[in-house]
């Protein structure tokens, strides 16, 4: 209560101060006729009025909070504080929140017409604090350069440095004035945490932008002139990008410019607008500053497109639909809105998406700007282009650097980060971040880290870190963060408020509440000092070890020299013996015929390796003695296969043995299962069905059975180069899980084999094409979309029941069988061992289907599949994606911030399931609980579905594809099917070590279990 009373008193005092400013300004206006003075006084009055409005809102909220606590304490003293938040939702609180509800992006916070709010003050304080720290460092650099120029007596450079120093000093003055103003508006009691624009998981912290900026500088108003300037001053506006001036207006005495510039920008973060006052012919003095991040401008333009679309179409969000009770449950409702003409989007791409507004200058004044940014994007796709194919993306694996248990990965940060070791800013550069505890530092600093990671057990920490005797714990207390402060552990900026910020009362460092327990007990000692102590300890240990080694080696040097000489002689004799044996042994003996009835024989490791039929590969060797090319069979070891008898020598070969070409595998007798292995020569390729990053998918006929299969062909070279070996093995294991029950809605595996350059997955051929092709031809009815969703739901349920998450659910990966049922295909992004509450963090998926937690690079569960399932249902029902954009970044922004829109007459159960599946909080998402798919299956959207009939295919499909023959490929892209079904030659030669990565790949579904070579 005392804190609230003190806060109320402080707010009242600030309001009175602002009123005094207004009263004094009005009095001064009556005493002078100077228009420049009038203009300056007018701007002061306007700023004070805005401050009073903000402070009065805060005052009313504090009074309501005080009354709420008193009322709660009088009624129920034990729970009074808990009732406080609910009491604050009164008219005043709602009116206050409404002022900030129209803020779409950070660009709106720079708009002069945006009222002062906690969000706006927080954003500006963080921005100004950072700019001030950078400018102070810049001024120090100028001072150092000026001293160097003085030593060299370079007058021209000295004059230039002095000019820059004066400008920098003036900027620092302006920044301090602006900071003081916003600090004065801060109220200590503010209990609300406002998300920081630079905090972890920030929606707008994106990479630099490249494109064409078209900017029109209109006019200025209420700009404060520097002291001692005459009435006839000239103003100039300069546009800077990445510390370089890119454009400048002509001088103006009327504060009007109306000049348009087109600036080509490459990987630029922000544009700086500097308003100069021309003091003399040589000196321009800055009087107003503004920074606009290009990512904020891009986001604002994207939101304008969405707003235009909403106004033209009349679609609403689920919340508005429920609140306005516009949802009408009619059987024909969805069919009416599902017609193609009802889902046509207005052409927003061609509309004017320029952003025009009065933007606030710091510390005083406004500037009128009109801006439009067009990105240079080769993969640009109009928002209203409808559904289209998109490839999946996967974060490439990087090398892990371990230091004291920390597992550091290189990470590109696109926001302002502070190194946890040296305390300097990363400044949009690559840094190192621990996978487990998120400790963040420079690339140059991570080897110097002295803190132990939480993932490292205490008993294993016998390191120099344990030997630092400085053990003074920090005294962290809850801290009201106001301004720009960074976490001393993870390096992210702290949000405004009290809930998540902690500050040490002794040394003053700040941290997130969740990071406090990770901060080492080095109160009063910097990390750099601790690193110097560690360096001394290491140096001492190394010196002592070297001294001990020198003493021991001095006594044994003579004896060791003799032993080394003797052993080298033996090695030379052994090498000579091996050399003789090698040259006398024919190099083409592997081509000798293999006995049809081998007898078990113990073979030493130095002798010939036993031949296994499933792992024979062919190479071509030229022998000058024979005058011909002999096909050599490369043999691989199978630990469980029986050894073969030694084949006859080369002299016993009377006639050449017919063998397949280099690009085929050798089919021989499986010694364990007595069954013939599948190889490349057993198939006849008929057509190409599709292409991917690593290879092709081809239609082929198995000669012996006259059965059609789809063969996925992957190049070993690309698999190795992209570190996808384990992913390929995992894909095979997922196929085996699907094979276990021959699941009706999963593509099953017939067999897999390999050659020297490729691996092959022989899969079911699903001839009806994918759902993307069908939905592009015609809109799905409600029944058809519901039917496909039910079968896909059972496929996901089977995966989840076996601890597998799919992570690449989309229309492209759902194939339509000739009988009208669907099959889920492409298991390349699946992950195993993902049971309930198990998590992973790999950044992968198809952009439009990726869940928010994946985009935020958080640990996620199998509930990401249910988010993708919601996007899938939305696309099937409405023929468009709920989250759209012209490129990946815009799509990601839409996923993180936009609400899906629905036709006002869409059935209630359809809106309900989409709303519950597309919930951004993964813990509240439908299907995220331990019941998993059962919760989805019991939703009213599936109320008319008999799940047992669906699983056993007893439900009549709503659509049957028309096929002319079993080999008809009309439902596949003609771009691929018209190609010749041949494998392109591969010139690269893989080493034996490379080939070992693919050992045990062969498999056949005819076996009771995977082949004996299958260790994948």
UniProtKB/Swiss-Prot annotation:
Keyword Phosphoprotein applies: yes
Enzyme class: transferase
Matches recorded under PROSITE patterns: AGC_KINASE_CTER (PS51285), C2 (PS50004), PROTEIN_KINASE_ATP (PS00107), PROTEIN_KINASE_DOM (PS50011), PROTEIN_KINASE_ST (PS00108), REM_1 (PS51860), ZF_DAG_PE_1 (PS00479), ZF_DAG_PE_2 (PS50081)
AGC-kinase C-terminal domain sequence ranges: 943-1013
Bias kind Basic residues: ranges: 546-568
PTM-bearing positions, type Phosphothreonine: 984
Enzyme Commission number(s): 2.7.11.13
Domain C2: 195-307
Record-listed ATP binding positions: 689-697, 712
GO molecular function terms noted in the UniProt entry: ATP binding; diacylglycerol-dependent serine/threonine kinase activity; lipid binding; protein serine kinase activity; protein serine/threonine kinase activity; zinc ion binding
CDD domains in the cross-refs: C1_ScPKC1-like_rpt1 (cd20822), C1_ScPKC1-like_rpt2 (cd20823), C2_fungal_Pkc1p (cd08689), HR1_PKC-like_1_fungi (cd11621), HR1_PKC-like_2_fungi (cd11620), STKc_PKC (cd05570)
Family, as annotated: Belongs to the protein kinase superfamily. AGC Ser/Thr protein kinase family. PKC subfamily.
Name by which UniProt lists this protein: Protein kinase C-like 2
Species assigned in the record: Schizosaccharomyces pombe (strain 972 / ATCC 24843)
